[in-house]
Structures are given as structure tokens and as C-alpha cells.
Amino acid sequence: MSAAAGPKVAFFASPAFALPVLEALRAEFEVVLVVAQPDKPVGRGLKLTPPPVAARAAELGLPLAQPHKLRGNADFAAQLRDSGADVAVTCAYGKILPAGVLEIPRFGFLNTHTSLLPRYRGAAPIQWALIRGETVTGTTIMQTDEGMDTGPVLLQEELPIRPEWTSVELSAALSEQAAALIVRALRTLETLTPQPQDEAQATHAPLLVKEDGFVRWADPAQAVLDRFRGVAAWPQTTAFFGGKRLKLAGLTLGQGKGQPGKVLQVGAGGLTVACGEGAVCIATVQPEAKKAQPAQVWAQGQNVEQGARFDLWEPPQG
């Protein structure tokens, strides 16, 4: 299909995750407008930096808008209307779309969501699918309404989750899947039948907070490992030992059992720590304000031996 033969597309997105989707769209259709979040201060120098999608759009010479707000923004509404977009596609854009904007394109807005809706509605579906131990996830193409991922479903495709994947690898796989699926949806846009979501099956995937990365040693070892996989990109896995905060990496299932948080073994293969059921092996430890180091080196430097115990942390109740 030539770009001229398909619908004209406005693309609303910001992070690097959405770049394969942008490339797929511009290869198949005419992208008449890219809409991204405003530039933000980054790094120690707080240099204003465009989000990855905005930077790529500028490189490609695509029309670009970065409005600070959408609701009540007559100038932006006019820009979207004047672009001639037949349909708009959103992919991790990061802003709720008001009704006045949703109504502008002739075919409305389509959202690429990285879960099998209605499961894992919200900002962090990839991370929570891993934390909850899912073995299959996928991508949904849905019509956007004013709710949070509540619109009718147009297309879905499953993706098996490999046991070694963290949120980094799963994000990359879903990004490519989303790129292919949105092209398929746009090619057949006028023949797709929207299917309402089953509200009774809805689950939620809220934005992660730092505490989501804290190890719950009382959990089964598999749950500790699944949490590690889910928070690998951010906030990463954090544990406490003697009141001091540590970042943990290279977690795998270990051998043995004991009191949650108890060190079962210190060796060249890492640090084996008991969980509520089973144990995990930790390859790398990073103390606060220090470089990451092999767990055995850290243990020797801190005189951590078999029988020592990590601090227990539990999420506050209520």
C-alpha cells in the first residue's frame, strides 16, 4: 500500500518505546502531524531535551506539536484539524485526551496498549504483567475514549513472555508487535468491528513508585524474581541490610530454604537468600553512592556470612 492510498495519520507519542511504531506508520501511511510531550530538563545540567519521538520527528522533517495542555487549547485543536488527519494513533503519549480533541479526526483515535485488555489498564502494563507472573501478554488496538484504556477493542494479538525476559526485553518485543498490529488495523480500519471490553475482567496497572522495587523477602522466591523482572528498567530492585539501601541485580532462583531474608550461602556464584518459599541467588550488589560489585565481593567486604539476615520490608497496610 502506498502512503497516499491509506488514511492520513496524526501520531501522539513520546518515549523511545514508540519509535518503531512511528517508523512503521511513516513507511505505510502519510504522517501529517506528530504530537509529543514538551521538552523537559534532563541530566545534571538540566538541559531542555525533547522526548525521543519529538527528536525523531524533527530529524524526519515531520510536522511536530508539543502542547503543554490539550484541554481548552484552541490553537492545538486548529492545528490538528488543519493537518487533515483522518485518524490519530496514540502510543504511550502520556496525557489524557479530552472529548474536544477526540472528535477531530474522522475515524477518531486508536490507541496501542501493551496488554490484553481489559487486563492491565493503566500506565505500566508491561511491568505489572511481569510482577504478577504472567506468561502471556500482548498488544491491543482499541478505540480511544475519555476513560483510562476503556474503549472498544479492534484488534488483539498475544505474545508469550520468555522466562528470562525483564521489562527491558518485553518492552522491545511489544514495541515491534505494536508497530505491526497498528499497521494492520489501519489497513482494515473500515472493516473492523469494535468489541466492548468486559468490565468484570478489568485489572489495573498503575504507574510504578520506588517502593514497588523493594524486595518482599516473605514472598515466594518466584514472586521475588518476577518483581525483579518487572522493575528492571525502573525503579530497579532494592533491598535493605543493616538499615542500608542496596540495589540488587542478576537475580535467579536459588537452592535452599530458611527464614525470609536469611543468607543461606555466600559463594562465587553469588549470594543465596531465603524467601517465604525457596530462595533466590543474587549476582550483583550496588551499595548507595557506590559502584555495582559482585555479591560475593560485597559480602566479604561487609563480613556478611551464612546466617546473616536482610532487613524485612512490607508495604504499609491500608
From Swiss-Prot:
Positions of (6S)-5,6,7,8-tetrahydrofolate binding: 115-118
The EC number(s) this enzyme carries: 2.1.2.9
Key words, A-Z: Protein biosynthesis, Transferase
Residue pairs linked by disulfide bridges in the UniProt entry: none
Enzyme superclass (EC): transferase
SUPFAM superfamilies hit by this protein: FMT C-terminal domain-like, Formyltransferase
Catalytic activity of the protein: L-methionyl-tRNA(fMet) + (6R)-10-formyltetrahydrofolate = N-formyl-L-methionyl-tRNA(fMet) + (6S)-5,6,7,8-tetrahydrofolate + H(+)
Gene3D superfamilies, per database record: 3.40.50.12230
Function: Attaches a formyl group to the free amino group of methionyl-tRNA(fMet). The formyl group appears to play a dual role in the initiator identity of N-formylmethionyl-tRNA by promoting its recognition by IF2 and preventing the misappropriation of this tRNA by the elongation apparatus.
Superkingdom per UniProt: Bacteria
The UniProt record lists the keyword Protein biosynthesis: yes
GO molecular function list: methionyl-tRNA formyltransferase activity
Signal peptide extent: none
Record-linked PROSITE patterns: GART (PS00373)
This protein's name: Methionyl-tRNA formyltransferase
Claim: Lipoprotein is one of the keywords in the record: no
